[in-house]
Amino acid sequence: MAKATKKAEAKTVTIEQIGSPIRRPDVQQRTLIGLGLNKMHRRRTLEDTPSVRGMIRAVQHLVRIVDEK
């Protein structure tokens, strides 16, 4: 008989863009696009991984963390 396994729910983080990428360095604009953000006040729920946390840290003045689960 096969074991019933539950997948552990991945931790998530919801971020909102609060700053405009206009007149920002190209690397910051690309980081926002990499996070799935490109317009003001858009929200995106992403997996909470070290790479995502690093991207958030790189543009922390342009985004805010809304929710962490």
From Swiss-Prot:
Coiled coil: none annotated. InterPro entries: Ribo_uL30_ferredoxin-like_sf, Ribosomal_uL30_bac-type, Ribosomal_uL30_ferredoxin-like. One of its GO terms (biological process) is translation. GO terms for molecular function: structural constituent of ribosome. CDD domains: Ribosomal_L30. One of its GO terms (cellular component) is cytosolic large ribosomal subunit. Keywords: Ribonucleoprotein, Ribosomal protein. Transmembrane segments: none annotated. HAMAP family: Ribosomal_uL30_B. PANTHER family: LARGE RIBOSOMAL SUBUNIT PROTEIN UL30M, MITOCHONDRIAL RIBOSOMAL PROTEIN L30. Belongs to the universal ribosomal protein uL30 family. NCBIfam families: rpmD_bact. Part of the 50S ribosomal subunit. This is Large ribosomal subunit protein uL30. The gene is rpmD.
